[in-house]
Design a protein with these regions (language model features):
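Asp-based, Mg2+/Mn2+-dependent phosphohydrolase catalytic module
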Residues: 1-124
Length: 124
């Protein structure tokens, strides 16, 4: 439905190709594997592949330290979404805890609070 509305999508991931292809079984979208986010190269490559300018793009991600920081480096608008947590991913869980404290700090400081939302709210 997204593509029917004229929007373009691309999956920019630090995962390898076999893992990404499992996610894309039902999604018709190009991808960039091993993107090395938050380095900007992958973001620029994504813009080039989609044929859009950074001002025309919005990056959607679930990790502050990779997705959002990388998009900010490139100057791309971005949206932080609530993440799915799997018990087997303890390394990511530790990073998420740190992200949670940073986001709470930003909300307390009222800096960018209008952009952060409440992604840690348990209600869906």
């Amino acid at each position: 439905q997204i593509h029917n509305s004229g929007l373009k999508t691309l999956l920019l991931s630090n995962n390898d190709t076999p893992r990404i292809e499992r996610f894309l079984e039902n999604i018709d979208s190009p991808y960039i594997a091993d993107a090395d986010k938050p380095k900007p190269d992958g973001y620029y490559k994504a813009l080039e592949m989609l044929g859009v300018k950074k001002e025309e793009a919005v990056f959607v991600g679930d990790q502050v330290f990779t997705d959002i920081c990388g998009a900010n480096k490139v100057g791309m608008a971005n949206i932080l979404v609530k993440f799915l947590q799997y018990q087997s991913e303890t390394k990511i869980g530790k990073k998420r805890t740190l992200e949670k404290y940073i986001l709470k700090f930003y909300k307390m400081k009222k800096k960018y609070h209008h952009r952060i939302g409440d992604i840690f709210n348990e209600r869906n």
